[in-house]
């Protein structure tokens, strides 16, 4: 395989002297003094790593050790590698530096075994011409074939990409539309916003970037409200990327309200992820943690959102991530209540980032597939005309009529469970690195407690007997012996990015 990058290795002796591990060619000598490069320092003594970029490495190395950078003196680096690569320019340097910092931090959770001492995540990155070339010909092979092989990394990039620390990193590359949207919202402090986006449009990634942008002003107090099953992950994400400071609070809606009941809360900005899942005053089967929520000054409120709005008042900006098409529990805020609460908010829309591989000779696209699924599920609900989601009624129906072996969409009418299960097993044979799952709607009785007992089966068809997902959190990466024989419920995959889905009924 042709390599599109080269690595030059140095030991660092006498605190700062570069000692090449191989004889340098004249081209390498020239490159070290005049070409764009990425470099990574590492200390075997203090267990620290630093990632940087430059257009003249030797000059930059001397600058690091000129006595003005205390962290370099304390780190006691004893080696450095310099990466040269094709199509090097300002954009690709920013991209590689950004992604290496992200991957190193995900590879060293809680700064163990190595601490990444970069003060920031590098420069902001937007989509550029060579982004795919750099991703597949430089970043991926450099990480897997060099860093992983030579002990600089514990895990390969494919595994790290499944980590929430990478998926929702505030360092991920943004599209130009996403970057512009963040600028509009952050600069317009006089208005509250609803960021509308279907599943897979990058609402959570946008939220982490927006928090990073807001926190550039260290005088601002920021509150991020997330679902309870994501609170720990969100704290880890903001913590590992150096954003967990006294002016940032990550909490749940119920905890926020209880704090508000104890006294005045003041935030310059309150961002709420998955605001379609905020609770309403639904007393049936009310959780014990809700006791006292809809009382006192909040006794007339009908939802957690209404309480949050009242607590924040006009002092702070509220930014809501919303998907009108998602509604999981009867205790969630209704669409009508949400619309009423946000009637004076400005609305923004995210475009889908979903992509499909169109078979040769076919003309349908990912947009046709998404519009078709929306039409199938919501055509009689009025939601497609609500103004909260983007929908094209003139989508190409061929995506659902294609019967070729490589068709993107398919369904079974005979023995659907058996055929769906066999289908993912076959996919696994030809794609051994993939993790394939069968998902389903509420077709069979479901109890969370059943997940602890692998002998309890819920799905039966012929000789096949399968069970619902064993856990709610982290199910896609479950290590259960029968993980790929479990049927995933909506609760197991809610808010999780999926590469592909096959649901059976």
State where each predicted segment sits.
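N-terminal pre-P-loop "Q-motif" helix
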Residues: 166-191
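AAA+/P-loop NTPase substrate/partner-engagement loops
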Residues: 217-241, 251-260
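Hydrophobic positions on the alpha1 helix immediately C-terminal to the Walker A/P-loop
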Residues: 206, 210
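Core RecA-like ATPase module of SF1/SF2 helicases and allied nucleic-acid translocases
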Residues: 201, 239-253, 257-269, 343-505
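Signature of the SF2 helicase/ATPase Hel1-core->accessory helical subdomain module
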Residues: 272-353
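Hydrophobic anchor at the beta1->P-loop junction of P-loop NTPases
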Residues: 195
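Conserved short loop/helix modules at catalytic or binding sites
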Residues: 26-28, 55-99
């Amino acid at each position: 395989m042709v390599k599109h990058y080269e690595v030059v290795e140095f030991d660092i002796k006498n605190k700062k002297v570069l000692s090449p591990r191989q004889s340098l060619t004249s081209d390498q000598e020239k490159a070290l003094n005049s070409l764009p490069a990425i470099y990574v320092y590492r200390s075997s003594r203090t267990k620290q790593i630093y990632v940087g970029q430059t257009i003249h490495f030797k000059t930059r190395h001397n600058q690091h050790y000129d006595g003005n950078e205390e962290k370099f003196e304390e780190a006691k680096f004893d080696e450095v590698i310099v990466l040269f690569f094709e199509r090097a320019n300002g954009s690709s340097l920013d991209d590689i530096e950004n992604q290496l910092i992200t991957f190193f931090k995900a590879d060293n959770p809680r700064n163990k075994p190595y601490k990444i001492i970069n003060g920031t995540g590098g420069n902001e990155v937007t989509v550029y011409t060579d982004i795919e070339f750099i991703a597949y010909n430089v970043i991926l092979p450099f990480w897997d074939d060099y860093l992983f092989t030579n002990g600089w990394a514990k895990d390969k990039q494919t595994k790290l990409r499944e980590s929430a620390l990478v998926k929702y990193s505030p360092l991920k590359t943004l599209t130009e539309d996403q970057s512009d949207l963040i600028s509009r919202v952050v600069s317009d402090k006089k208005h509250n916003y609803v960021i509308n986006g279907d599943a897979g449009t990058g609402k959570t990634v946008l939220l982490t970037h927006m928090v990073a942008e807001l926190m550039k002003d260290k005088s601002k107090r920021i509150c991020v409200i997330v679902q309870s099953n994501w609170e720990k992950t969100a704290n880890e994400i903001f913590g590992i990327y150096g954003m967990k400071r006294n002016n940032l609070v990550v909490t749940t809606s119920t905890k926020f309200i209880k704090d508000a009941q104890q006294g005045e809360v003041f935030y310059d900005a309150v961002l709420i992820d998955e605001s379609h899942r905020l609770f309403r005053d639904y007393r049936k089967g009310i959780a014990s943690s809700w006791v006292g929520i809809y009382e006192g000054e909040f006794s007339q409120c009908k939802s957690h959102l209404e309480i949050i709005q009242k607590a924040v008042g006009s002092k702070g900006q509220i930014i809501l991530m919303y998907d009108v098409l998602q509604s999981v529990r009867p205790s969630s805020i209704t669409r009508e209540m949400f619309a009423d609460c946000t009637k004076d908010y400005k609305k923004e829309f995210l475009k889908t980032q979903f992509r499909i591989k169109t078979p040769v000779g076919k003309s349908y696209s990912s947009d046709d597939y998404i519009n078709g699924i929306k039409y199938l599920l919501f055509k009689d609900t009025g939601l497609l005309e609500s103004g909260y989601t983007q929908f094209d009624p003139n989508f190409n129906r061929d995506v659902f009529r294609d019967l070729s072996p490589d068709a993107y969409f398919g369904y079974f009418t005979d023995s659907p469970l058996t055929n769906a299960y066999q289908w993912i097993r076959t996919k696994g044979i030809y794609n051994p690195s993939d993790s394939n799952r069968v998902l389903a709607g509420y077709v069979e009785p479901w109890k969370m407690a059943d997940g602890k007992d692998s002998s309890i089966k819920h799905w039966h068809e012929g000789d096949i007997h399968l069970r619902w997902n064993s856990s709610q959190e982290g199910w896609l990466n479950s290590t259960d012996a029968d993980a790929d024989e479990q049927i995933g419920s909506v609760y197991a995959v809610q808010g999780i990015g999926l590469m592909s889905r096959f649901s059976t009924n």
